[in-house]
């Protein structure tokens, strides 16, 4: 039994869009599984818990019962119909990975085990972070597919640091760690801008690896259709989205607000376009700091992003046959 891997999230509502709660991952039967992973690996003992650890529950609790009823049952112009398109699609919320604030490595081990069980059940994983260390155990779990996976990364920052303060698995290092995983093949990085933890050496390391880096200036110049064209066709893909990759006018609740990110129309086009190119095995949305939100605007766009991902996957025929 693996009930110890996850625990029920907060209350009112306690699951994303009031989808059924399923914390027994040994008996998982779902097309789409939502999983909260609250904690990355800290660089300092005082940095855990951080505000990002509140995001999984904040995203779940941002919608009222009325909002949920409309979102699940009414016509959605983003999708051209109801969220699940009237199809027999099973979405579950697996709760949050059980935390052990005294043993952060154990938290990562639990996150990886949970993700492996979700992937092994042929469920599409939607992980809610947490800071950007969270995808590291999830990407390790992609090993279960035994195929090369294209990693698609949206972020203001490159995330290629080997270590910070001696820690190799924190929020500045997920793409470096991914590049070391034999099952990660092509890496496409979108939206880089401003100043982050990367130095000249990390940028060169990414280039030497062969990462396709499309900074925000090139992205806006060439357009999202060309960005999508540069991503290899067919998949499979794993998508990791740092909220600061999206423009702070629509996602202000981040720790590193940097102007010039993806706007909503680009986000929607990107999500639908990637899903139509091939199978997206899973995605994560990380680095939301709820305490910095303005008028709930970040939560609104987070919910819209996730719903567009779900609705696009349904319409792409992911769960037929």
Task: Give each language-model segment a name.
Residues 2-321:
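Conserved alpha-helical scaffold segments that buttress catalytic/binding sites
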């Amino acid at each position: 039994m693996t009930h110890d891997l996850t625990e029920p999230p907060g209350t009112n509502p306690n699951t994303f869009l009031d989808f059924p709660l399923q914390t027994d991952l040994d008996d998982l039967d779902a097309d789409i599984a939502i999983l909260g992973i609250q904690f990355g690996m800290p660089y300092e003992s005082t940095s855990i818990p951080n505000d990002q650890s509140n995001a999984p529950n904040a995203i779940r609790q941002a919608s009222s019962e009325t909002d949920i009823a409309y979102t699940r049952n009414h016509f959605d112009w983003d999708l051209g119909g109801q969220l699940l398109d009237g199809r027999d699609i099973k979405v579950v919320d697996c709760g949050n990975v059980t935390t052990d604030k005294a043993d952060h490595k154990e938290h990562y081990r639990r996150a990886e085990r949970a993700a492996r069980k979700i992937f092994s059940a042929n469920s599409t994983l939607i992980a809610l972070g947490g800071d950007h260390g969270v995808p590291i155990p999830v990407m390790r779990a992609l090993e279960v597919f035994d195929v090369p996976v294209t990693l698609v990364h949206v972020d203001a920052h490159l995330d290629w640091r080997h270590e910070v303060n001696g820690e190799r698995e924190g929020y500045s290092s997920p793409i470096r760690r991914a590049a070391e995983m034999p099952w990660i093949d092509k890496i496409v990085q979108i939206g880089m801008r401003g100043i982050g933890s990367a130095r000249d050496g990390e940028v060169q390391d990414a280039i030497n690896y062969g990462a396709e880096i499309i900074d925000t200036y090139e992205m806006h110049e060439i357009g999202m259709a060309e960005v999508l064209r540069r991503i290899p066709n067919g998949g499979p893909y794993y998508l990791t989205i740092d909220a600061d990759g999206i423009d702070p006018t629509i996602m202000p609740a981040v720790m590193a607000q940097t102007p010039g990110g993806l706007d909503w129309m680009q986000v929607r086009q990107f999500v639908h376009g990637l899903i139509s190119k091939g199978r997206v095995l899973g995605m994560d949305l990380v680095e939301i700091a709820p305490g910095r939100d303005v008028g709930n605007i970040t939560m609104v766009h987070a919910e819209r992003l996730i719903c567009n991902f779900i609705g696009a996957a349904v319409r792409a025929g992911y769960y037929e046959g």
